[in-house]
Amino acid sequence: MKIIEEMKSFERARETYVPEKVNRQDERKMQWFRDSKFGMFIHWGLYSMLEKGEWVLFSESLDVREYEKLAGDFEAGKFDARAWAKAAKNAGMKYMVLTTRHHDGFCLFDSKCSRFNAMNSAAHRDFVKEYVEACREEGLKVGFYYSPLDWRFPGYFMPSLFWENALELKKQCHDQLMELMTNYGKIDLLWFDGEWLALGGMSWSPEQGWFRRPGWETSEYMKDNYFWESEKVINEIRSLQPDIMINNRFGWEGDFHVRERRIDDIRTDKPWDSNDCIADSWGYIPGRPVLSLRELIHNLIAIVVRDGNYLLNVGPTGDGDMEPEQVERLKQLGDWLQKYGKTVYGTRGGPVLPGSWGGTAYCGNRVYVHIIEWQQDTIKISVPDNKLVSWHPLNVCNAELTEDGDSMEIRVPIDSRDMLDTIIELEFEDKICWEGVCGEEKDIYGLGDGLSKAE
């Protein structure tokens, strides 16, 4: 009888939900994001101690109570938020996003809504507080990742059968978001994840990726904003953090869009980021190959010329340390950006449509041509309705440029090309005016092609 009543309550909630009106953030308040181009993503939590990735609780069907006991061993003796922030700054990153809580439900902050948090762990520390302070000391914008779901709640998997439990999950989500938005000063960015998982009917494995489990009904309830009351929550967050940017993974359109481990087409009408891993896993797994400097630069440029941001993930070890090889690779990228950052920061993608060869980014009356793959002897581009005043290569010799009407052809001898990125600066008479491209979202959750992968 109780199960039947809970199923009826579930259906009533879905049928009677009326969303509140919610507005996207003012474009002027999002300019910092468009200008930043590059940020650090950090996946870190109890799962890091098991060294099998952030999904280990679910993917290996671990006992929830046994998993919770890991908190008693979570000392994080090498955790140093300042070292993390310095690594991000040295890499040329302008903001950071930390997993304040992942799908396992463990909070890295002092939550009064759940005892499953870092203050009740062996470390007895508020890691989010330390992280926020470190970001501000290094002049970095502060971002929070938060997953509304919690694998410890059976109501998440089957809310129609465990509706009261699902409502407890929902309340925990709402209350913890209010804690995060209230207790840590100004927060610049909120990166949701998990509203879309629909685990009542979906599963994932490294071999198959996402697949529908045979015999299960499609769990559309978790794709619906009615369960989380997304619009209401967004408005409450806005009242506490009026300048915050929020992504599109919480049942609404978002201030900015997420493209997970893919690039897709150029899009200039709305901010977006493409997130990827420096070592092919979000949570820490030892021995994973690290992206080369060339791969990192190619990923960054491929995203920038499409008018997006590159959010690059680092997964620290269980004790809170970043692997030296990853820190060194980030520093190498930062050194490169020290030289050529003007072609990246503060630019917009365009006015030339990108291709596998590379693309262009512009700022004011200057266009920066980034050639990351020479597929022919020359690169031909067109910048209409503007007169070329001057041009010069930034990192190569013996470049040639010839004009033919409103098009121009760039040629660089093979032995003079920069295999990381051949950059040509074009100066025009007038400021670049380009209408841009309105993007159409594709499968933003899929593991698509486009980003370079470590071998």
Segments (PLM) and residue ranges:
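Mature catalytic domains of secreted/periplasmic carbohydrate-active enzymes
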Residues: 2-455
